[in-house]
């Protein structure tokens, strides 16, 4: 099984790549700049998970394609079973052309997971791709993600690795009604029937927590 992640930020590396790798996927990260170069050199990202008392540190193997290499980036998306985006909701429009090219060349239905901390991220992607692919977009699945893990840091280590530091929770709620077969089986990912309710519950808990501190 193959997964492609557009973006090489904290959530892309510290959650999406880690969870997909643990579930048996060969992960390709599509990034740019110094982070992409370091990942390509080391062929892995160093993940550190800590709850303040215990710390776990391990390497997650990844392939890396620089977004400047359009042909390779499109090929990575076209050959993936699962595609993730983790670029920030405001940046999504900038990756829609690339995503459309890859999905157009995909031989089978692909599930796209938007790790964007935005209630309508999947809707934004689907709408943008419909303008580019027409009815062809309907054979693919598009879901947002309600993420429990906070990934606070992304740094370069002395030996040249990219290290991301987050907390241990691994649960990710996804929209089960928006997926297509074969549904991706990812450890910690929970398909639900009312995705919007879960997103708003997270938003309420986050806002309420900050309002009382």
Describe the role of every protein-language-model region.
Residues 1-4, 10-11, 16-213:
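Substrate/ligand-engaging "lid" and interaction regions
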């Amino acid at each position: 099984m193959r997964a492609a992640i557009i973006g090489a930020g904290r959530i892309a590396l510290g959650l999406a790549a880690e969870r997909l790798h643990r579930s048996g996927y060969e992960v390709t990260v599509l990034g740019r700049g110094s982070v992409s170069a370091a990942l390509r050199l080391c062929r892995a990202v160093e993940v550190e998970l800590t709850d303040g008392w215990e710390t776990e540190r391990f390497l997650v193997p990844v392939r890396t394609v620089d977004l400047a290499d359009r042909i390779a980036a499109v090929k990575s998306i076209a050959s993936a079973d699962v595609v993730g985006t983790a670029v920030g909701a405001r940046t999504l429009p900038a990756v829609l052309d690339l995503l459309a090219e890859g999905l157009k060349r995909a031989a089978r239905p692909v599930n796209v997971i938007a790790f964007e901390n935005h209630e309508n991220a999947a809707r934004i992607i689907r709408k943008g791709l419909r303008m580019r692919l027409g009815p062809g977009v309907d054979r693919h699945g598009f879901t947002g993600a309600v993420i429990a893990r906070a990934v606070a840091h992304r740094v370069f280590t002395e030996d040249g690795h990219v290290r991301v530091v987050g907390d241990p929770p691994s649960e990710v709620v996804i929209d089960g009604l928006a997926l297509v077969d074969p549904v991706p089986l990812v450890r910690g990912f929970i398909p639900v029937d009312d995705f919007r309710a879960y997103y708003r519950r997270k938003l309420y808990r986050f806002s309420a927590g900050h309002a009382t501190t």
